[in-house]
């Protein structure tokens, strides 16, 4: 069998297509890379075009062998695990060759890194269900987050159910993508070079009121910074209203709106 590096488009369907191609072409993968992430190597590189039919065949096979493995595959692809494609590729190869029995061994060297990464992803999703702060941007609710993992697909149902009568978007600064929702329809789409517009006067007042409320209900004599950081890790503070400086509460635009290349079209919601 030939050793090969595959380049793909970064999508989950594209990754599954890579697995299909590796078996169809009888090639052993040494790396699966997206765009500029291709490592310097002496192995040949082949670009694999996404084929949804081939991807669906691979996924159906995984589900048939083990629904648990299929869930690990989907969630594992959303994690920040270094070289995650190769970890997941090895998981599928082992599943196809040995069956699902190894999934019971939590110390398995193929399984363990993925389990740990998925646990981290699930924890981050849980945290963001409580740590997202939305602002009123001219009739549209807008929020920003800075996750380590791609959490938006897993937060989608929670926020769409919670704000089903609103129009909103939630922007992931780390991965430059956003969740859009309006009138019962939602989509997670790429959104590069986005910058949230400053608040109008009404929104600025509400932000300030929230911060004052947060500061007022605090019991100074019982402050415990270490305990607070345990339950509310500091890396989440950058997008939370109650931890912002003066500039966050200064009105500069009337009304508030979304700004940034591609944003006006995306937030029109007509194409969801």
Model-derived regions: residue spans:
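Glycine- and acidic
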Residues: 1-5, 141, 195
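Long, compositionally biased intrinsically disordered terminal regions
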Residues: 167, 178-179, 198-265
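Conserved small/polar residues in nucleotide/adenosyl-binding loops
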Residues: 270-271
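Internal, well-folded beta-alpha domain core
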Residues: 101-190
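N-terminal ordered "arm"
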Residues: 1-52
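A generic structural motif
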Residues: 30-41, 169-176, 191
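Short, hydrophobic/amphipathic alpha-helical patches that form generic packing surfaces
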Residues: 14-25, 90-97, 157-161, 208-215
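Charged, alpha-helical interface segments at or near domain boundaries
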Residues: 43-126
């Amino acid at each position: 069998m030939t050793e090969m590096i595959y380049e793909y488009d970064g999508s989950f369907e594209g990754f599954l297509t890579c697995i299909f191609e590796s078996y169809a072409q009888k090639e052993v993968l040494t790396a699966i890379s997206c765009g500029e992430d291709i490592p310097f190597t002496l192995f040949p590189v082949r670009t694999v075009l996404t084929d949804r039919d081939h991807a669906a065949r691979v996924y159906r096979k995984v589900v048939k062998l083990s629904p648990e493995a299929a869930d690990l595959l989907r969630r594992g692809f959303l994690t920040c695990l270094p070289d995650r494609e190769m970890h997941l590729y090895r998981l599928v190869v082992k599943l196809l060759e040995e069956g699902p029995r190894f999934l019971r061994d939590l110390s398995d060297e193929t399984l363990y890194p993925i389990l740990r990464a998925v646990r981290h992803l699930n924890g981050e999703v849980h945290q963001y269900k409580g740590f997202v702060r939305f602002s009123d941007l001219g009739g549209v609710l807008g929020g920003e987050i800075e996750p380590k993992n791609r959490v938006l697909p897993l937060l989608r149902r929670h926020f769409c159910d919670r704000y089903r009568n609103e129009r909103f978007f939630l922007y992931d600064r780390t991965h430059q993508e956003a969740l859009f929702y309006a009138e019962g329809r939602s989509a997670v789409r790429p959104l590069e070079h986005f910058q949230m517009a400053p608040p109008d006067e009404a929104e600025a007042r509400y932000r300030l009121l929230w911060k004052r409320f947060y500061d007022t209900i605090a019991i100074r004599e019982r402050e415990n910074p270490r305990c607070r950081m345990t339950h509310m890790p500091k890396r989440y503070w950058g997008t939370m209203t109650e931890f912002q400086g003066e500039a966050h509460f200064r009105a500069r635009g009337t009304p508030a709106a979304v700004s940034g290349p591609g944003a006006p079209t995306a937030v029109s919601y007509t194409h969801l």
